[in-house]
Amino acid sequence: MRLCHSIILFNSLISISICSKADDPALLVASEFKEHFNVEEKQLETVEELLIKMKKLAHSRSFKGREFGHDAVEDSKKEVAISTQQGTINKKVSPFLFEGDIFLSRRQAVDILKALSKDKTKRLRRSFVSDKTATWKTMPIKYRFHESIDFYTISQIIAAIRFWEDSTCITFENVSDSPDGDYIEFFSGQGCYSMIGRNGGRQGISIGESCVKMGVIEHEIGHALGLWHEQSRPDALGYVTIERDFILPSYISDFLQRDDEIDTLGIPYDLGSVMHYGSTAFSVDQKSKTVVTRDSLYQQTIGQREKLSFYDVATINTAYCKDECKSEKTKCENGGYMRPSKCSECLCPDGLGGEKCEKNEDSKNAECGGIIKLTEEWKEIESPNYPDPGYEADQKCSWLLKAEKGKRVEIEFIEDFSFLCTSTCVDFVELKISDDLRNTGFRFCCYDKPEISFVSQTDTAIIIFRSQLSTDIGFKIQAKSTDAEPRTTIAPTIITTTLAPITVDAPNVWADWGEWSMCSRTCGGCGIRSRVRSCRSKKCEGRRQEFGTCNLKACPVDKHCAKLLSNNRLCNGKVCTKNDIAISSCDAPQCCPPFINVDGVCQSDQENQHDELWLSI
């Protein structure tokens, strides 16, 4: 790497800077990697070159005949993220990162590229790193804080480390100076990123300004312990579909099916994993869904960054802690198991608590929850202070529902329903009604009340209420024992069928427009829908994707909005971290600006905007 040198001409007192590529932001970022990771400049350049080869190979297979360079330049102008809960990926470091937040070793990059080159039809089998040399052999794992980390970030990192320590057999030790051997260095870098597994010597974890959230920090530590992203597992396509037409073309390599020998360790797929992509990962507009759950009830579950899920922890415990607690005889119920850090205690699935996971989890900042024994008569359950003044931020409740012997639990949502609206639920009610109470359930938020009736697979169900950021009405549910057959899902979400890539020699040849996506909001002209078309020639002029307004019927009167409410329904899929407080007018059905209510239909006096508002990318 060439540097800037200052030459002082003493006779004229003129300072001239002779600068080369050291002023290049990419090279300045490269110095960040060299400072915080055990990596030489040549190795860093090799990893970058391998990542470019992966991108070009994946791009050529998906968009045959199109120019990768042109797409890469256009994509570099846009913001990208792997989850709306994790912040956007810093453009300076993205050339060095795989799947948005993974800094690969040279060996890992070579292995992935080889797998891609050999067989394009198979999937890289990943959940936990299979390379045994990449696991941490010596405990405690030493770590230090770089001088760039501020006090608040340090407190969040310590909290995340303690969660890992409490839930697993892994231990950590903070050291002030750089020790000999292997260690982790937390630093405030250009975004959130980490390496996969132990790589030897100094190994950085970047916790940038947009990453200071416990779930994000736990995610990056998870990578360092050996966890890949959840949707990279070999069984992922049984639970999600990848909508290629909505992915930024030069990032298609972060979704392709590949093949390698990396183990899932027998842990079930978890749509609520903190390691899972969000629904708009690498999206062309940060709104269109690129990851669609086959069961649409899970759509707003994926991408959470609140905390590790039960199965996230179980993966690490299976990899590192199998020999712990062998001599203990603690018995745990409902899918719980002995806590490796303290074998006399049970580690319980979310929503469960007690000494043996036999009861509901303790509530937080509210008097709520409990064990409810059901009969054939309906019993009602509601969130704290429902409906007025409604729930508050940072509350949690859980209810353990038990049907009569030989029967199941039936659940229906009734009356008003309203939560902070985000693409990944931050405030939500969760239903765990499958026969696996360990796995994450359906999470519901926003203000569209689920209209179907749910029936559990067994005689047990769990309801969890969680609020993190906002205040709102909440929910009311009625539940009873039933002989009905299980109803735990609805038809899969279907968006667009992708055509096989075909390239023709003629210029500017577009395929037909695909189907419209679902509207992002249900009323008031508040949402958008989109559709895409593929370029069949090497290059096309015109828009690839177009957007339109939708659901122009005015939103119904909300009888509870006479109080102060946050305008969280206009977040456009992003987390409302700041509440815009206003007194809502509640005497008539509502429309979102610039629309106004005209006889129950949202219209605008701007030309053509009352019908379809077109945008393009």
Curated annotation (Swiss-Prot):
SMART domains: CUB (SM00042), TSP1 (SM00209), ZnMc (SM00235). It is an enzyme of class 3 (hydrolase). Its EC number is 3.4.24.-. GO terms for biological process: molting cycle, collagen and cuticulin-based cuticle; proteolysis. Zn(2+) binds at H219, H223, H229. Residues 127-322 form the Peptidase M12A domain. Residues 1-22 form the signal peptide. Residues 368-482 form the CUB domain. Keywords: Cleavage on pair of basic residues, Developmental protein, Disulfide bond, EGF-like domain, Glycoprotein, Hydrolase, Metal-binding, Metalloprotease, Protease, Secreted, Signal, Zinc, Zymogen. Pfam families: Astacin, CUB, TSP_1. It comes from the Eukaryota. Residues 23-126 form a propeptide. Disruption phenotype: Worms exhibit a trail of old cuticle that remains attached to the posterior part of the body. SUPFAM superfamilies: Metalloproteases ('zincins'), catalytic domain, Spermadhesin, CUB domain, TSP-1 type 1 repeat. Residues 507-556 form the TSP type-1 domain. Residues 317-358 form the EGF-like domain. Gene3D superfamilies: Collagenase (Catalytic Domain) (3.40.390.10), Spermadhesin, CUB domain (2.60.120.290), Thrombospondin type-1 (TSP1) repeat (2.20.100.10). Binds 1 zinc ion per subunit. Its main location: secreted. The active site is at E220. Its cofactor is Zn(2+). This is Zinc metalloproteinase nas-36.
